[in-house]
Each structure stands twice: as structure tokens, then as C-alpha cells.
């Protein structure tokens, strides 16, 4: 019993485990958010999307729904089970990322990006609240700084991984008619980066 109390104490081993899991979630958050930037040329070529539309997809559509849902989801984090809110949000934005690979044009892709923004809006307020419970006040600044590293990891991974998937798919299937299900490189990339969040 003493060992259990030590494990689950504020700032104890389980608190550190929670922090690591939240960093991983934040990493997935940024991967799914940033992956669009590495796919811009493929999207313009295959879907006929313009630079202006890409700017809308990358910025306005995502940010609007992130901001709109951020406040109510932050309030929900105060009232409901935070780990459940984070888990549901993670699955939702991961599914929306995968569905982005099925988009047939600007409208459907924008709708899926709306979904990504809405899902990701659940993560940060609930995580800040959760970590504040698991760590004492004199450690929260360093804990939140550590948590924030997930953003930089995610941004780096999204560009590197996205580029690798695109290059691999193009070299393996120069003629996409011969690719599995006729998938384009951008479609495979959306699906591959979204899937891990569902199983986490």
C-alpha cells in the first residue's frame, strides 16, 4: 500500500508517466496539424487546389474551428473526465486526418480539416488541467515547458515523415493506377499519420 501511495503521489512515478503520454499526444496533435504543408504540391496537382485555398485549409479553416471549440471544450474539461475528453479528441482528430485522404476536392478536405481543428481543441486545456493536478505548483512551469516539446517534435516529425512517405510511394508506384486501391501519395500520407492516434 505504501508503494502504491508513493507511485500515485503528486509528482510521483505515475505523474511522470502521465506527462510522457501527454507529450506523445501533443506530438500526434502537431503531426496531424502540420502534415498539410508537406503535401501542398500533391494536393495542387491532384485536386487542383490553389495557393489561396491551401492558405485557407492550412490556416483559416483549422484555426477558426480550433478557436470556436476551444472555449466550450475547455469548460468541459473543468466539468468532465479529462482523460476521456483527451482520448475522444485524439481519436476524432486522427479519424478526420485519415478521412482527409479520401477528399475529392476543396470542400470535403476543408470539412475534414474543420474536424481536425475541433478535435485538437480538446487536448491542450484538458492536458494543462490534468498536469496541474499531478504536479505541485513549484514544478508546473518546468512540466508545462517539457510538455511543450511535443509541439516541436511533432512539427519536425510531420515534415520528415510526410516527405519520406511521399517519396517512397512515388518511387514504388510511379503509375498510381498500379498502386494499391489506386491511392496517391498524399492520400497514403494522411492515412498513415492519422492511424497511430486511433490505436494510442
Model regions: which residues?
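Cytosolic juxtamembrane N-terminal segment immediately preceding the first transmembrane helix
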Residues: 1-31
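Residue-level signature of mid-helix packing/kink "hotspots" within the transmembrane helices
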Residues: 34, 62-71, 121, 155-156
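Extracellular/periplasmic helix-loop-helix junction of adjacent transmembrane segments
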Residues: 39-68
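Membrane-interface helix termini in secondary transporters
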Residues: 42, 71-75, 164
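Helix-breaking motifs and short loop linkers at transmembrane-helix boundaries and internal kinks
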Residues: 48, 81, 102-108, 119, ...
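Conserved MFS/SLC helix-loop-helix module at the cytosolic interface between two early adjacent transmembrane helices
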Residues: 68-107
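Cytoplasmic helix-loop-helix junction between adjacent transmembrane helices
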Residues: 111-152
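Helix-loop-helix hairpin linking two adjacent transmembrane segments in secondary transporters
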Residues: 147, 151-200
Amino acid at each position: 500500500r505504501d508503494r502504491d501511495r508513493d507511485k500515485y503521489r503528486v509528482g510521483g512515478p505515475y505523474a511522470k508517466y502521465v506527462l510522457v503520454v501527454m507529450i506523445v499526444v501533443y506530438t500526434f496533435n502537431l503531426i496531424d496539424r502540420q502534415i498539410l504543408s508537406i503535401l501542398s504540391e500533391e494536393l495542387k496537382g491532384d485536386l487542383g487546389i490553389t495557393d489561396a485555398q491551401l492558405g485557407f485549409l492550412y490556416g483559416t479553416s483549422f484555426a477558426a474551428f480550433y478557436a470556436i471549440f476551444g472555449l466550450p471544450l475547455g469548460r468541459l474539461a473543468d466539468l468532465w473526465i479529462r482523460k476521456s475528453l483527451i482520448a475522444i479528441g485524439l481519436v476524432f482528430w486522427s479519424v478526420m486526418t485519415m478521412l482527409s485522404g479520401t477528399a475529392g476536392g476543396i470542400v470535403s478536405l476543408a470539412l475534414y480539416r474543420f474536424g481536425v481543428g475541433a478535435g485538437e481543441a480538446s487536448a491542450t486545456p484538458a492536458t494543462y488541467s490534468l498536469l496541474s493536478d499531478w504536479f505541485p505548483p513549484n514544478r508546473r512551469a518546468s512540466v508545462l515547458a517539457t510538455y511543450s516539446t511535443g509541439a516541436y517534435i511533432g512539427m519536425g516529425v510531420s515534415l520528415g515523415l510526410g516527405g519520406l512517405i511521399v517519396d517512397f510511394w512515388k518511387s514504388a508506384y510511379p503509375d498510381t493506377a498500379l498502386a494499391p486501391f489506386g491511392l496517391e501519395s498524399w492520400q497514403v500520407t494522411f492515412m498513415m499519420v492519422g492511424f497511430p492516434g486511433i490505436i494510442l
